[in-house]
From Swiss-Prot:
Gene3D superfamilies: 3.40.50.1970, Dehydroquinate synthase-like - alpha domain. GO terms for biological process: amino acid biosynthetic process; aromatic amino acid family biosynthetic process; chorismate biosynthetic process. Catalyzes the conversion of 3-deoxy-D-arabino-heptulosonate 7-phosphate (DAHP) to dehydroquinate (DHQ). This is 3-dehydroquinate synthase. GO terms for cellular component: cytoplasm. It is found in: Cytoplasm. NAD(+) binds at residues 70-75, 104-108, 128-129, 141, 150, 168-171. Its cofactor is Co(2+); Zn(2+); NAD(+). Its EC number is 4.2.3.4. Belongs to the sugar phosphate cyclases superfamily. Dehydroquinate synthase family.
Length: 362
């Protein structure tokens, strides 16, 4: 087992990474209160709700659960209200702990519920998808979607513990594993060239769910994100760099309808658009763009825009991105592999050109 600590100004919390941790009583916080509510979905619950419940009961907790519909299209205020209703019906108070058992949707909605219920209660992240394990479960971003934009309603609210059991990936569909690798590759591309090079050598093992490589990879991603969050918890500076490909990717998700492309798939295509734009601006070299494209392709990820989208479809969605300031588009781009920056007010004609290069319709 590996433990990565997220060091914040006023407190810290651990991220435990290893095999068979769901049933390890030693990784659960001592201070959970007597009542715990697990939030999950039917897909995850069939595998992991019982072992987690039994482990919590061994710790003396009174455990209940609520199951939300499965999928990005259910990351909504309605799902949030389902959690609130369950908490209120069972008379849960401020001493209750919420546990998010699932992927990024479950983690984001549960975290926002914890931030809001009675003005804040404890919550634990138990991410069961690779994308959630390396990204969304760490750092305290919680949110639900709106029909006009992704993650537009939310809060920064940190978990008290993150428990990452790499064995949960065995039951994950291959498409979901691949989608998680988009966020993994992102970390190397923006901040860690040696890690990017390690991924070039080990990506096939990760696709095959080699446990040793998975644990190293997840721990490295969590450490990179923990370091960034420690410097910039509420995304006023460096944390924005973690959004490589996301402005383009969120446009894809919103335009197609949530869930048609997985988040990681949209981020992969968006990362290629950002890389091509970086090359057009004279930063990234052609060979570096090709390296990124090859690595994404080896992870079975898309590197081009959906065939149903035109370049002009992107900008209306992109202008609603949370990084937009004073009406100016801000994009995460690459100086070189391993070094990212935030570009402000980039020429929109160049943005459109980059999208067209990455289009199936060009």
């Amino acid at each position: 087992m590996v433990c990565v600590n997220v060091e914040l100004k006023e407190r810290r919390y651990p991220i435990y990474i290893g095999e068979n941790l769901l049933t390890d009583t030693g990784v659960y916080p001592v201070k959970m209160g007597d009542k715990v509510m697990i939030v999950s979905n039917p897909t995850v619950a069939q595998y992991y709700l019982t072992p987690v419940t039994e482990t919590l009961e061994k710790l003396g907790c009174q455990v209940s659960h609520v199951l939300l519909p499965d999928g990005e299209k259910y990351k909504t205020l309605d799902s949030l209200n389902m959690i609130f209703t369950a908490l209120l019906k069972e008379n849960h108070g401020r001493d209750t702990t919420l546990i998010a058992l699932g992927g990024g949707v479950i983690g984001d909605v549960t975290g926002y519920a914890a931030a809001s219920y009675q003005r804040g209660i404890r919550f634990i992240q138990i991410p069961t998808t690779l994308l959630a394990q390396v990204d969304s479960s760490v750092g305290g971003k919680t949110a639900v979607n709106h029909e006009l934009g992704k993650n537009m309603i939310g809060a920064f609210y940190q978990p008290c513990t993150v428990i990452i059991d790499t064995r949960t990936l065995v039951t994950l569909p291959k498409r979901e594993v691949n989608a998680g690798l988009a966020e993994v590759i992102k970390y190397g591309a923006i901040l860690d060239l040696p890690f990017f090079e390690w991924l070039e050598a080990h990506i096939d093992n990760l696709v095959a769910l080699n446990q040793q490589d998975l644990q190293y990879c997840i721990a490295r991603c969590c450490q990179i994100k923990a370091d960034v969050v420690a410097r910039d918890e509420t995304e006023k500076g460096d944390r924005a760099l973690l959004n490589l490909g996301h402005t383009f990717g969120h446009a894809i998700e919103t335009h197609l309808g949530y869930g048609n492309w997985l988040h990681g798939e949209a981020v992969a295509a968006g990362s290629m658009m950002a890389a091509v734009l970086s090359e057009k601006l004279g930063d990234l070299s052609y060979s570096e763009v090709a390296r990124l494209e090859k690595l994404l392709a080896r992870a079975n990820l898309p590197t081009v825009s959906p065939d149903t989208m035109q370049a002009e479809d992107y900008l209306p969605h992109m202008m609603r991105d949370k990084k937009v300031l004073a009406g100016k588009l801000r994009l995460v781009l690459l100086k070189t592999l391993g070094q990212a920056y935030v570009a402000s007010d980039t020429d929109k004609s160049l943005v459109l050109d980059a999208i067209r290069v990455c289009s199936q319709n060009n």
